[in-house]
């Protein structure tokens, strides 16, 4: 990759991330304003680092047609440029009238993620469906929102994909079971959506992270020493690994690996598998092209 290409990509990423955090309708203090822009720069640096990492990996021999719901959020906005870089065709669902800024190379279609009737007809010819819709900044106080947004959008996506016979459905869930009852509503909704996937007999990859470290989401780094101790102790090791922290880069690579290795039946990708995606992706591509 040339220096000019890196600079161009960095500039586009900065523009995209500044666009994400600028919201005139929400009053902020100067401190909030500065913090948002610091997060935007950090996100752009993270985007460039991930893009350079992906460029060093071998590409899949088969290009996928990918339909994404929730593509303008924290995970989706990092995933889409990587899928495009790996020569996949990406179609993103956005709300009618949305001013969300997306890479020019992806196709944008209008619809409501809470009503599959508004977008079912534009899913094809996609062969892979990634569902990333979720209430931003989950907290115990948002139980009603989880059922109104996460549950309804998941049900609609699963139903539409089952009716269309989608080749591969990828669902971003959450690690469970978990001993923390404070997020029980969030976990319950994701578990119910997983059950729907099973009942509709979709060929699906279910990805179960716990907390995703990245720009604006770094405070849990303080918990790393605690996690290390729990992973070392035999009676807490399994839970610590299941509910471990993953980085945004690890999660994006796990999603890419899922896209490029469709499954028959159901595959669950937990925290240990998410962490190892950077190693497994080149092996999977080598296996496919052998």
Describe the residue ranges of each PLM region.
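Substrate-positioning beta->alpha
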Residues: 149, 153-154, 189, 219-221, ...
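SDR active-site strand-loop-helix element
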Residues: 69, 93, 132-133, 169-175, ...
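N-terminal Rossmann NAD(P)H-binding glycine-rich loop of SDR-like oxidoreductase domains
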Residues: 58-86
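Non-catalytic terminal and boundary segments that flank Rossmann-like NAD(P)-dependent oxidoreductase
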Residues: 2, 6-65, 281-290
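Conserved beta-loop-beta element that borders a ligand/cofactor-binding pocket
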Residues: 173, 195-218
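NAD(P)-dependent short-chain dehydrogenase/reductase
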Residues: 215-238
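Core catalytic loop region at the nicotinamide-binding pocket of NAD(P)H-dependent oxidoreductases
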Residues: 243, 247-249, 253-285
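NAD(P)H-binding glycine-rich loop region in Rossmannoid oxidoreductase-like domains
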Residues: 98-156, 160-163, 178
């Amino acid at each position: 990759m040339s220096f000019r290409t890196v600079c161009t990509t960095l500039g586009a990423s900065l523009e995209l991330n500044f666009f994400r955090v600028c919201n005139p309708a929400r009053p902020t203090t100067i401190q909030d304003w500065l913090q948002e822009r610091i997060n935007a720069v950090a996100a752009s640096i993270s985007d460039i680092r991930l893009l350079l990492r992906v460029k060093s990996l071998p590409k899949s021999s088969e290009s996928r047609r990918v339909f994404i719901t929730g593509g303008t959020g924290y995970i989706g906005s990092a995933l889409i440029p990587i899928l495009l870089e790996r020569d996949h065709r990406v179609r993103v669902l956005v709300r009618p009238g949305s001013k969300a800024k997306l890479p020019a190379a992806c196709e944008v279609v209008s619809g409501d993620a809470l009503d599959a009737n508004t977008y079912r007809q534009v899913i094809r010819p996609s062969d892979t469906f990634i569902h990333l819709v979720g209430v931003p900044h989950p907290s115990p106080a948002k139980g009603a929102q989880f059922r109104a947004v996460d549950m309804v959008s998941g049900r609609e996506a699963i139903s539409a994909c089952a009716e269309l016979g989608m080749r591969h459905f990828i669902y971003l869930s959450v690690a469970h079971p978990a001993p923390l009852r404070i997020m029980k509503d969030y976990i319950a909704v994701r578990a119910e959506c997983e059950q729907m996937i099973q009942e509709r007999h979709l060929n699906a990859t279910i990805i179960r992270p716990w907390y995703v470290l990245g720009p604006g989401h770094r405070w849990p780094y303080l918990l790393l020493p605690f996690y290390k101790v729990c992973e070392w102790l035999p009676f807490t090791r399994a839970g610590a690994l299941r509910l471990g922290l993953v980085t945004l880069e690890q999660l994006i690579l796990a999603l890419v690996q899922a896209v490029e290795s469709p499954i028959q039946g159901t595959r669950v990708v937990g925290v240990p598998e998410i962490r190892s995606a950077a190693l497994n992706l080149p092996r999977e591509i080598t296996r496919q092209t052998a």
